[in-house]
Structures are given as structure tokens and as C-alpha cells.
């Protein structure tokens, strides 16, 4: 079961929710008032991800790469693939964030400096967005820092709003944590239990736990936002699975989130296939791109032993590794590396060569992975089932891939990509077993 959406829906005459700090910008009311004339149009539900450039905890956190994907890309992929929204937007004040949002297929609202301050609230930015978009009746405010969000979560919440008549729905997670009052010197010198009786301390399996907001999303109708609330009216919570409830705030959260998203994240509509072949560009991936020439005019290259181990790791997993280059590399020099990989050099059309290898092995494109770093790799990167690029690859290559390594070419990028492939293949195998 993907999630639990039980819980009493609370109806209130005066909306109560999380008030904004300070006075939000005045909202221009929607002329439609949420109702159409004649034939009534379905309410316009817009996904809105707030992503300002001035994050204090982690600079440009919203587009920092998590498991090879810009952080904001994880929630954009889930929102777009859910099919639950009439439009998907990113509200930002930063050019780089705008470019990433557009690459993933989102529309961009350029937020003003007035709602981009450290003191600005989410509500301020949402109200400004609505001022420019009278067509929007419902806003699904999705947090960019929740990378394990899945389309099914968003589909079910959209149904709760549209079909079950809720005015607001927000995400929660169930936790089994005992809470104690804080000790304050001079005021309270001893602590007291807040949600348990220590004399009858329950076992985890005997206790339902408590519901906490996990911050993944807040859906609210326009009329609530007009009154300054994201939670109110007829409201309900949506309980997310614990493994999907990931929030990134500070640096220490990053490695934990990375491991979680690799195992529980959403990787797209198409099911991953088992990779059978990895093709790797030589110059700039296997090597760092530097070429040394000896006194007798012999070509000398260097590579990282970690990358050789990565290649060996893939071979042990049954994945063939082949090398390719558009340059007239010395096959003798490459053979001396003892990688035992088939290779083609002086290649003018890399896609044609990879296609020939694919057919020779009886594979579909989804069973091929490619690690590239140059413009000449672009077509291959776009065609294969799994694509990657070193951290120092050209911008054309980086825009075409699904995974960007932390390591540079010739400095561990192949090993990193190999580990990424193995993790995804573990995910594929687990899915098949289920």
C-alpha cells in the first residue's frame, strides 16, 4: 500500500491553519470565483514549487545534485508524471534554477524581490503567484526538499480535493517517538513526559504512534489562501510512507537523503530495465583528458585505479563494458591498462557504433548505459536507458544525462557511475521479485 489517507476530515466555520508571519501581499481575487458560467469548467489545480536562490543552509540547495539529479528535479518529475495538475510551476528569483526547471518541463514564475527575502513566508510567494494567475483555483505547494515524493501520492491528494470536497490537505508521517518537556533553568528543573506514562511504557507494536507534518506538500483552495491560510476549511491529512518522508534542510541531511532516494525515489514512468552493456567515452571519462608525449613521441595517458575496479565490479555483475573515442587513441597504450574491454577509436559516428554493438548483443536501448562528456556523446546519452556524465563534462553532455557524477573524468567517475548502476539494478531485481 503506497500510503494511508485515513484520518478525520475536520470542518470548521473559521479556517484555522498556519498563519503567515507579517502581512502577505494583497491578493487580487479570481474573477471566476472558482465557478464557470454556462458549462462549468473543472477547477484548475496548479503544482507550485517555491525555489528561491538565497538558501542559507545550503547555497543553491534547490539545484544541488542529489543522486545525480538536481534536487528540484525529483519533485518536478513526480508532479509532471502524476497527471494530477493542469499546470506545474516553479517560483524562483534565480536564473540557474529557472533553467533547470524548464529543462524538466515546468513553467516558471519569476518571483519579485519582495517575496524573496529571508523573512518572506511561503504564503507570501504563493499569494504573489496567484496575483498573476487568475486561472488557478487550487494550489498544490510541493516542497523541493522532499525528493522521495511519488506521483501516486499527488494523484490521491488531488482526488481528495476534487472528488471528496476537501478545502485543504497536507502531508504527514507516523512516528513512534516519546516526547518530554524541555528543562529550563530557573523555571522548570525537571522534565515531564508529554505523551506516555513511564510506569506503563508501551511497546512500539502496541502503540499507533503520532502524526507529524512532514512538509512534503500543502494543497489549498484559492478562497483559503485569500484569507491567509494554507490549512483550514474542510481539511484532512494524507499519511505518507515513512521511507518516502525525506526532508533536506542542512548538509548533514544530504548523504542520508541520497541513500534513501536511490532506494525509494521515483525514477520516471518507464520501468527500469536491467543494464547489460555500459559504453564509456575514453577521453574525459576513463582518462582526465590529458595526453602526455614522451621523448620518443609515444602517447602516455593516466587513469584512476578506482575506475578499473568499477569496470571489474560491473563485469562481475554480468554487465559488459566497452570503450569508445572519436580520437585516434593508441590501442596499444589502452591495452596496456589491462581493462579487457572491447574498444573502437577514430569513431566519427558514435551512435552508429553503439547501435551496432547493441544489435550484436541482441539488446534494446533501455538495456544500454552510456557515460559521456562531450558534444559528440549527446545523441548516445539521449538514446540509452541510463546515461551519466562526469562532474567536469561539457554543459551539452550534462543537460542530456540522467545522472551527473560528483567525480571528474579520470578521477573516479566510472567507479561512481558503476556503483549507481549496481544500486539501480538492485532496485530492478527487487521489483521483479515482488
From Swiss-Prot:
Regarding tissue, the record states: Ubiquitously expressed. Expressed in pancreas, kidney, liver, skeletal muscle, lung, placenta, brain, heart, colon, PBL, small intestine, ovary, testis, prostate, thymus and spleen.
Sites bearing N-acetylmethionine, chain numbering: 1
As one GO molecular function, the record gives: N-acylneuraminate cytidylyltransferase activity
Residues the record lists as Omega-N-methylarginine modifications: 37, 52
UniProt keywords (A-Z) are: Acetylation, Methylation, Nucleotidyltransferase, Nucleus, Transferase
Q: Where is this region: Disordered?
A: 1-42
Intervals of motif BC1 motif: 15-31
What residue intervals hold the motif BC3 motif? 269-276
Q: Which GO biological process annotations does it have? A: CMP-N-acetylneuraminate biosynthetic process; glycosylation; N-acetylneuraminate metabolic process
Where found? Nucleus
Where the record places motif BC2 motif is 200-206
* Binding positions (substrate): 52, 62, 111, 120, 122, 143
Pathway(s) it belongs to: Amino-sugar metabolism; N-acetylneuraminate metabolism
The principal location of this protein is: nucleus
Provide the function of this protein.
Answer: Catalyzes the activation of N-acetylneuraminic acid (NeuNAc) to cytidine 5'-monophosphate N-acetylneuraminic acid (CMP-NeuNAc), a substrate required for the addition of sialic acid. Has some activity toward NeuNAc, N-glycolylneuraminic acid (Neu5Gc) or 2-keto-3-deoxy-D-glycero-D-galacto-nononic acid (KDN).
The domain section of the record reads: The BC2 (basic cluster 2) motif is necessary and sufficient for the nuclear localization and contains the catalytic active site. The localization in the nucleus is however not required for the enzyme activity.
Q: Which PANTHER family match?
A: HAD SUPERFAMILY MEMBERS CMAS AND KDSC, N-ACYLNEURAMINATE CYTIDYLYLTRANSFERASE
Subunit info here reads:
Homotetramer; the active enzyme is formed by a dimer of dimers.
Q: What is the name attached to this protein's record? A: N-acylneuraminate cytidylyltransferase
Source species of the chain: Homo sapiens
Amino acid at each position: 500500500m503506497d500510503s494511508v489517507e485515513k484520518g478525520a476530515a475536520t470542518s470548521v466555520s473559521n479556517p484555522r491553519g498556519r498563519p503567515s508571519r507579517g502581512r502577505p501581499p494583497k491578493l487580487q481575487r479570481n474573477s471566476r470565483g472558482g465557478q464557470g458560467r454556462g458549462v462549468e469548467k473543472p477547477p484548475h489545480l496548479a503544482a507550485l514549487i517555491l525555489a528561491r536562490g538565497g538558501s542559507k543552509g545550503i547555497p543553491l540547495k534547490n539545484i544541488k545534485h542529489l543522486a545525480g539529479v538536481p534536487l528540484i528535479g525529483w519533485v518536478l518529475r513526480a508532479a509532471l508524471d502524476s497527471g494530477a495538475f493542469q499546470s506545474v510551476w516553479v517560483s524562483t528569483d534565480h536564473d540557474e534554477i529557472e533553467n533547470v526547471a524548464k529543462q524538466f518541463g515546468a513553467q516558471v514564475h519569476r518571483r519579485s524581490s519582495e517575496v524573496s527575502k529571508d523573512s518572506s513566508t511561503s504564503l507570501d510567494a504563493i499569494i504573489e503567484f496567484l496575483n498573476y494567475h487568475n486561472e488557478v483555483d487550487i494550489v498544490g505547494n510541493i516542497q523541493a526538499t522532499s525528493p522521495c515524493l511519488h506521483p501516486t501520492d499527488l494523484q490521491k491528494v488531488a482526488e481528495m480535493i476534487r472528488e471528496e470536497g476537501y478545502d485543504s490537505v497536507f502531508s504527514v508521517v507516523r512516528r513512534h517517538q516519546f516526547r518530554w518537556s524541555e528543562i529550563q533553568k530557573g523555571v522548570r528543573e525537571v522534565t515531564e513526559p508529554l505523551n506516555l506514562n513511564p510506569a506503563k511504557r508501551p511497546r512500539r507494536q502496541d502503540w499507533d504512534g503520532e502524526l507529524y507534518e512532514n512538509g512534503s506538500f500543502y494543497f489549498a483552495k484559492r478562497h483559503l489562501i485569500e484569507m491567509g491560510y494554507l490549512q483550514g476549511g474542510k481539511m484532512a491529512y494524507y499519511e505518507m510512507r515513512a521511507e518516502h518522508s525525506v526532508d533536506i534542510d542542512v548538509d548533514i541531511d544530504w548523504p542520508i537523503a541520497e541513500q534513501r532516494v536511490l532506494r525509494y525515489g521515483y525514477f520516471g514512468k518507464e520501468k527500469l530495465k536491467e543494464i547489460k552493456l555500459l559504453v564509456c567515452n575514453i577521453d574525459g571519462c576513463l582518462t582526465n583528458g590529458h595526453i602526455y608525449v614522451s621523448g620518443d613521441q609515444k602517447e602516455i595517458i593516466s587513469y584512476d585505479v578506482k575506475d578499473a575496479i568499477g569496470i571489474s565490479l560491473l563485469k562481475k555483475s554480468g554487465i559488459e563494458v566497452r570503450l569508445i573515442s572519436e580520437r585516434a587513441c593508441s590501442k596499444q597504450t589502452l591495452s596496456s591498462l589491462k581493462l579487457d574491454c572491447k574498444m573502437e577509436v577514430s569513431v566519427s559516428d558514435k551512435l552508429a557504433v553503439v547501435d551496432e554493438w547493441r544489435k550484436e548483443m541482441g539488446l534494446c536501448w533501455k538495456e544500454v548505459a552510456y557515460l559521456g562528456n562531450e558534444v559528440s556523446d549527446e545523441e548516445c546519452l539521449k538514446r540509452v536507458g541510463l546515461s551519466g556524465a562526469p562532474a567536469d563534462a561539457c554543459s551539452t553532455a550534462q543537460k542530456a544525462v540522467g545522472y551527473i557524477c560528483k567525480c571528474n573524468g579520470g578521477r573516479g567517475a566510472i567507479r561512481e557511475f558503476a556503483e549507481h548502476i549496481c544500486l539501480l539494478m538492485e532496485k530492478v531485481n527487487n521489483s521483479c521479485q515482488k
